[in-house]
Regions:
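Active-site beta->alpha N-cap acidic-glycine motif
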Residues: 1-73, 80-99
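Generic structural signal for short, solvent-exposed loop/turn connectors between secondary structure elements
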Residues: 1-4, 11-18, 44, 114, ...
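Catalytic domains of cell-wall/extracellular-matrix polysaccharide-remodeling enzymes
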Residues: 65-192, 196-197
Length: 198
């Protein structure tokens, strides 16, 4: 049976509380790859992420483009954000995991020089099986995002592959993502309706 994982990048953002409500209503957990620069202004939201049973992941501090940071600066951004995330877990009264999941901005592409930096730091990179276009300006409609999620989940199920969606609950500019929240709500309702009765 195919397992579906949800992950969200670039938050915490203005839409994160509404997204947490949707996930709570569906009894679903996710991984939130947060930006360090957003954490100071959203400690209550980040603490709720942890208390609600979700995982916090590291999306670096500033969301710099590939090649924009020297190797040492990239490691510093990762380490700084790790420390901020560990502080969020402490605030939530929870133990932080030994290793915090890491996803670099824009993902890790072939020939990406950042791969060598991660290897030296002994850090694994978390990719995805599908990244949705909810980061675009303007974002696709909720139904377009929902349709893309369904198509990918169905294709993976037909191939007996697990799914790891990459969506966005914020942006490096602090944008809201209401279309993402609604698409996730529609998708989780669909999954719940399709689940066999207990």
């Amino acid at each position: 049976m195919t397992t579906i994982h949800l992950s969200f990048d670039d938050g915490p953002g203005p839409s994160t509380p509404a997204l947490l409500d949707v996930l709570h209503d569906a009894s679903c957990t996710a991984t939130f790859f947060v930006l360090g620069k957003h954490l100071a202004g959203a400690l209550d939201v980040a603490t709720r992420i942890a208390r609600d049973g979700h995982r916090l992941g590291n999306h670096t501090y500033s969301h710099a483009k590939p090649g924009a940071l020297a190797d040492a600066a990239l490691i510093d951004e990762i380490d700084t954000t790790d420390a901020l995330i560990r502080d969020v877990y402490r605030r939530a009264g929870l133990a932080a995991p030994d290793t915090i999941p890491l996803r670099l901005p824009y993902g890790l592409m072939p020939q990406d020089g950042r791969a060598a930096v991660l290897a030296r730091a002994q850090r694994e990179h978390t990719g995805w099986t599908a990244i949705l276009d909810d980061w675009q300006r303007p974002a696709p409609s909720p139904h377009a995002l929902f349709d893309a999620m369904c198509a990918h989940a169905d294709a993976c199920a037909a191939q007996h592959r697990d799914v790891l969606f990459c969506l966005h609950d914020g942006s490096r500019h602090g944008d809201a993502r209401p279309h993402t929240v609604e698409a996730v709500r529609l998708f989780l309702n669909r999954q719940r309706a399709a689940a066999p009765p207990r």
